[in-house]
Amino acid sequence: MSEQISEQSEQNVYGASSPVPAGESSPSAASAPRTKVRTHHLQKWKAEGHKWAMLTVYDYSTARAFDDAGIPVLLVGDSAANVVYGYDTTVPISIDELIPLVRGVVRGAPHALVVADLPFGSYESGPSAALAAATRFMKEAGAHAVKLEGGERVAEQIACLTAAGIPVMAHIGFTPQSVNTLGGFRVQGRGDAAEQTIADAIAVAEAGAFSVVMEMVPAELATQITGKLTIPTIGIGAGPSCDGQVLVWQDMAGLSSGKAPRFVKRYADVGGELRRAAVQYAQDVAGGVFPAEEHCF
């Protein structure tokens, strides 16, 4: 089926809270149908200067809520290792643990572009391994694109995947899968290291990546890279100049425990609301208040 979209469809691809070109009204579910977001929409938004949001998501119900909210890109991140499976780092999670999550998200998000993370150990050995891993996510889970970490060192893998028709989102700066070699959770690209970060960004773009995540990179450097690249940049702890922004949804919504990273803004207290609801439910059951007559047949 043709990927060409009419001017009207290009306008309708934006969700209620997504970027809309100047002079156009923001369509809502009631006023205009939404179109499936594709990689070329992100390129168009960069060219027009429209910023957009990406969130991680790991299940059908949350994906449906974010899709309804108009979030255009959803990432089934290897951060599921932490927030779904309870691992200390993202290193242990496997393809087999991620694929069922991607399936659920794809079913719950008919409009969003769904990106699947390639986990540690699934692509580092070379293009063949990367192709095998990415193919599984595309065929078995229905992902629309994959993401992998690294700059120049994974350029061959990115080129291989794009040549095979698999869209690739790159990830540079702080790469969580390499936490053991980076010496912990540290800002990347400071001082002399900035040149390597720039080289990594250029390398992934030239290899064919359709976008690049920059994590924990100085804002000034992220601004410089965003200006150099023709592909969209997505920031997480990389300042406001990136074309898009991404957060782990549990951090964004206040479900994560402990102190949030500096780059996180919490927009809700979902964790607190869940605890309050659970306590009230348990009290109602213990007190014989629930179920009441209106809950019975």
Swiss-Prot record:
Ranges in a coiled coil: none
E.C. no: 2.1.2.11
Compositionally biased spans, kind Low complexity: 16-33
Keyword Magnesium: yes
Enzyme class: transferase
Active site: E215 (proton acceptor)
Cofactor(s) for this UniProt protein: Mg(2+)
Residue ranges with Polar residues bias: 1-15
Keywords attached to this entry: Cytoplasm, Magnesium, Metal-binding, Pantothenate biosynthesis, Transferase
Record GO biological process: pantothenate biosynthetic process
Domain of life per record: Bacteria
Complex and partners: Homodecamer; pentamer of dimers.
Protein name: 3-methyl-2-oxobutanoate hydroxymethyltransferase
Gene coding for it: panB
